[in-house]
Design a protein with these regions (language model features):
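A short helix-to-beta-strand connector/capping loop
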Residues: 49-56, 97, 126-129, 170-172
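Conserved anion/nucleotide-ligand pocket segment
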Residues: 147-174
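NAD(P)+-binding Rossmann beta1-loop-alpha1 motif at the extreme N-terminus of oxidoreductases
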Residues: 1-51, 55-59, 63
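Rossmann-like NAD(P)(H) cofactor-binding subdomain of soluble oxidoreductases
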Residues: 63-65, 70-147, 160-164
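Conserved Rossmann-fold dehydrogenase catalytic segment
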Residues: 136-144, 168-180
Length: 180
């Protein structure tokens, strides 16, 4: 599958590395002024891992969204609402329609106390149905090959089963849940 990872910090870079490792076609997006993206373009590595050459790097959000069947969002939780507003202002909401949106961040919106799935619904409406990827783990452990279990949670059981099948591997065994 074609997977775009939005956010090229430690976890976003890991999600791109992991998706490529299990056979997916991956594009990793970062903002034009991102020091993380600059480092990845220069060395194809950060302090935790080296990206395979087949992962494409971009600072063009349209390109990343257009490319993807699955969009993994791994940005700071407090930046989610402004990022979604930016997408809508640029007319890019239609590029998310019909795609799987996976939130890989934790926490609540600090000023409202709202869950991140609620923030997505408020900003994008009911046309996009996000799921969340959560669980314990450290990038450095995964890169060393230490396996773990994680959860993908959402409302649609069939979609969750499908995502578990697409993303599970000997390194990460996924389970699904409905507790958002």
């Amino acid at each position: 599958m074609k997977i775009a990872v939005i956010g090229c910090g430690r976890w976003g870079t890991f999600h791109a590395w992991y998706a490529a490792r299990i056979g997916h076609d991956v594009m990793l997006w970062g903002r034009k002024n991102s020091p993380h993206l600059a480092q990845l373009r220069e060395r194809r590595a950060n302090e935790f891992l080296t990206l395979p050459e087949d992962i494409r790097l971009t600072d063009d959000i349209y390109e990343a969204l257009y490319f993807a069947e699955i969009v993994i969002v791994s940005i700071h939780a407090q930046a989610l609402r402004s990022f979604l507003k930016e997408l809508c202002a640029q007319g890019l909401l239609e590029n998310l329609l019909g795609k799987r949106l996976i939130l890989c961040m934790k926490g609540l919106e600090i000023y409202t106390g709202k869950r991140l799935t609620t923030v997505v619904r408020e900003e994008l409406g009911d046309a996009v149905h996000p799921v969340v990827w959560v669980g314990p783990g450290h990038v450095q452990d995964f890169v060393r090959g230490i396996p773990n279990c994680m959860v993908i949670a959402g409302k649609d059981k069939e979609e969750l089963r499908n995502l578990v099948e697409i993303l599970s591997s000997p390194l990460i065994r996924f389970y699904y849940g409905e507790d958002l």
